[in-house]
């Protein structure tokens, strides 16, 4: 009996060394993956991921795409960088849809034509004539016209006299001459849509960059260049609406300023393609380049103020433009100086570090510019 049991035990199939090794490899691979997908500290990063030595921990390093995409819902030092601009992207997408459906795209000439007769009979024609001649050329959109007509002196007249009829005839001719060019060249809104498109592209590119850059060196290089292109696009297109609408009656300066800021934006994108542009030593250079792009818009703003210094609309818009510039400029300073994390390294790894503040200021500046464009 003992010999028989021993023979059965000997005949029982034994696990091969290859099978045992495979099990150990699978177990080891799972353990390695678990360790690999953990967040690491700055000193463990490859060189291409080292950007801010004041952010000590909570880095993702060379994760696979699937894990990176899932990390959008987890906590790490890029979480708020992704979401601040991703929320901004959806916000500007909604504003673009709202603008296309709610804000008039051209001068409502037909509405103006039907409403003018009644309005003319209810206003002081002398005041109307002088106001239209002095203010309409610089603000030809229909809501400006209607605002002017409604805000003329409230005197009413029930019986037209010869003087009123002469003024009415003069107003009719002058108004026709002023609005006639708009029939053949209606006021376009492409500059405003260009700005909205630039903002959408910038915010989406930024979110994508912060989410995917930790995958590999090649992906990081591509994503960062896309991010720089988005910043240049936002800055350049931000000047399209104020330049176009301020100088639409002066094609030379309109084309000059639009061409200059466009060429400057393209040049900035080309410079950003250089590998050295991403190095730590060029951090201040990067911020200065984008700051210089924004500062170049000071020329058309001052030019506009010289021409329309007595127009309330121009002063109102300039106020918003100055606020926008301050927000963008403050963002560039925070980005370059890496405040506040340089004061307390490691304390702002998850929330409150300079790049997150920079993102918030960019979105605030873009929203300010949107309000100015309305």
From Swiss-Prot:
InterPro entries according to UniProt: AdipoR/HlyIII-related (IPR004254)
Annotated compartments: Membrane
Q: What tissues contain this protein?
A: Expressed in roots, leaves, stems and flowers.
* Primary role: May play a role in abiotic stress response.
Q: Name one Pfam family in it.
A: HlyIII
The protein depicted here goes by the name Heptahelical transmembrane protein 5
Q: Name one GO cellular component term.
A: membrane
Keyword vocabulary terms for this entry: Membrane, Stress response, Transmembrane, Transmembrane helix
* Keyword ATP-binding in record: no
Q: Which residues lie on this side of the membrane: Cytoplasmic?
A: 1-79, 213-228, 278-288, 335-347
GO biological process terms, alphabetically, are: response to hormone; response to sucrose
Stated membrane topology is:
Multi-pass membrane protein
Q: Ranges in the Extracellular compartment? A: 101-191, 250-256, 310-313, 369-374
Q: Is Membrane a UniProt keyword of this protein?
A: yes
Q: Which residues form a coiled coil?
A: none
Q: Where on the tree of life does the source sit, at the highest rank?
A: Eukaryota
Family of the protein in this entry: Belongs to the ADIPOR family.
Bilayer-spanning residue ranges = 80-100, 192-212, 229-249, 257-277, 289-309, 314-334, 348-368
Q: Where does it mainly reside? A: membrane
